[in-house]
Amino acid sequence: ATHPEKLGSPLTNKDITTDFAAALVELVTPTIDSAEGLFDHLSDLHHFLYASMGDELLWNFSMPCAFGSESDIRLAEYGNSNTGMLKHIYRKGLRLRYGSIMQCVSGIHFNFSVSPESWRAISSSPSQAFIDAKYLGLIRNVKRNFWFLLEHFGASPIANKSYLLDRSHALEQYGETDLFLPSATSLRMSEVGYQSAIQNTLGIRYNDLGEFINAVVRGINTPYDKFKALGLLDEQGMPQQISAGILQIENELYDIIRPKRTGASTSRPSNLLRRHGIEYIELRGLDVNPFIPEGISATNIKLLDLFLMHALISDSPYISEQEIIEIRTNHSTMVERGRSKDVQLIKAGSLSNIADVRNIFHAELGMLAAVPYKQ
């Protein structure tokens, strides 16, 4: 599929662009201060998109549809400018490193920021250092409580056989064409989903902004033998990946949440963060809701706001090496068995039944939700 001309340029259109593939459309909303307003805008984008698609339909599931061959997946193109070519070569690198089908896994990215007025309600004179520390605390708490999002937003327990190809996995047969895990919440967030195991070696803990930036830059500058062996140029002598680093660019960091800062397209994200600090966070671990045309509802958005506000205002100690292991273990447990009633999560070094963990967390969210809201 090619990008319809009616949708404008995927390089410059701020509302409708493409992700990895030409057929993988990405809808982008502006910053909006209400769940209803955000949902209405997203719904409008869907209506406009459908009016421009002819006989094509949107696939409303995070895991890709059936593929005959990975060669059928056409990379997104952005023209011949330096910026456009860099975006295309980056995608060629993703295809080379991970395969095209993995890159067609899709989800919801939810950006969250606190207004200047709200920061002043928290602190009489909020410096950028204060804001950075609070956002990092939010990120740490999201990682600690990601089980909650997997439970409420996980919607991909099944995948077509063609997604796995010849990869090893522990999924079970479901019908003639699909594979699944009976108690899974999100195969998208599992080891067979949108992941890169080598990135765990970067040891990112979000305890300090400078530490985070240095780890990402180290990932860009550190060659990985497997990627190096693939070569920077293809058989025709054309670039097929930006570099042989663990990360080609900052955006290749696959995590459930990332700190972000807007700026000129010519500026590196790591430099923007280092110079200006965190402007907002990007929550990436949300599956597309297959039962809603827009992939997310206004009620879902309100729940995310509540969850993220809880993460922002709650105590958030630094993440230790031991807690990294606990967070990763809980993540694996929830993506693979999160629908099972006897699931246990590690909390403070000991196992707790998910029902007990859920009751405590729901009570905390309930107290926050009861606070009168002033817009």
Would you name each region that the model predicts?
Residues A1-R95, M102-I108, F130-R140, R144-W147, ...:
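Terminal catalytic/cofactor-binding subdomain
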Residues M102-S115, Y280-D287:
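Histidine-centered divalent-metal-coordination microenvironment in nucleic-acid enzymes
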